[in-house]
């Protein structure tokens, strides 16, 4: 879709330039042949039709239960080595992330991006150093592989209900599931049979309901279709 939109934009600009040339010089004897040539070029330019997708877009919006100000987390002398390994995955990392900052961890596979994320999320204990979140920080973590989140024998509705904190929030749970394209009998199926993309959508639901003021997302577009990726991008920009 993006390729077609870009191509169409260039074609429209070219059409505009050619039409302007023809308008200005078609009556000019010295430019008549060039104007005729431009008309022929115009006839050959085509604008591709962009057909609307038949797939639905989930509705993804994230809120914060508590607003976070100033510093969110401070990392000091952070090192990590897996048991039995000869080398550290990373060593002596020091950085501070402020509230409102958007930070991307970029690097080749195997460099330790996920390990660092897990240390920040308290999913792994660092070999040395410390991660200090401010008192009001409420991190929400979306792991690269959320399989461990879906091993319990629960249906989708029951799983999502565990993140509301209230026993009478059935309507909120159903609305959240619906916005993530789970409805009707589908909410009664076991979370253990979900596809990778469906698990990710359920994880978005967890973050929507728990309302963290810091989000740690490790490759959150894995297994996702373009409609969901676009919806996630919109949700993160709000």
Predicted regions and their residues:
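ABC ATP-binding cassette signature C-motif
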Residues: 1-6, 61-238
């Amino acid at each position: 879709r993006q390729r077609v939109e870009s191509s169409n934009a260039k074609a429209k600009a070219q059409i505009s330039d050619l039409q302007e040339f023809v308008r200005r010089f078609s009556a000019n004897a010295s430019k008549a042949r060039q104007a005729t040539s431009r008309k022929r070029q115009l006839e050959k330019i085509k604008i591709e039709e962009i057909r609307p997708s038949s797939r639905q877009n989930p509705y993804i919006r994230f809120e914060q239960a508590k607003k976070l100000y100033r510093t969110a987390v401070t990392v000091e002398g952070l090192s990590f080595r897996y048991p039995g390994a000869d080398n550290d995955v990373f060593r002596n990392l020091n950085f501070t992330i402020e509230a409102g900052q958007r930070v991307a961890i970029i690097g080749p596979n195997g460099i330790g991006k996920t390990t660092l994320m897990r240390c920040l999320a308290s999913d792994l204990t660092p070999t040395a150093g410390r991660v200090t979140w401010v008192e009001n920080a409420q991190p929400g973590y979306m792991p690269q592989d959320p399989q461990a989140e879906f091993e319990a024998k629960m249906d989708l509705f029951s799983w999502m209900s565990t993140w509301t904190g209230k026993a009478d929030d059935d309507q909120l749970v159903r609305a959240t599931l619906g916005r993530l394209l789970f409805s009707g009998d589908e909410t009664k199926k076991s979370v253990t049979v979900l596809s990778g993309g469906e698990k990710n959508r359920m994880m978005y639901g967890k973050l929507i309901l728990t309302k963290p003021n810091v989000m740690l997302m490790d490759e959150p577009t894995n297994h996702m279709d373009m409609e969901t990726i676009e919806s996630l991008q919109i949700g993160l920009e709000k």
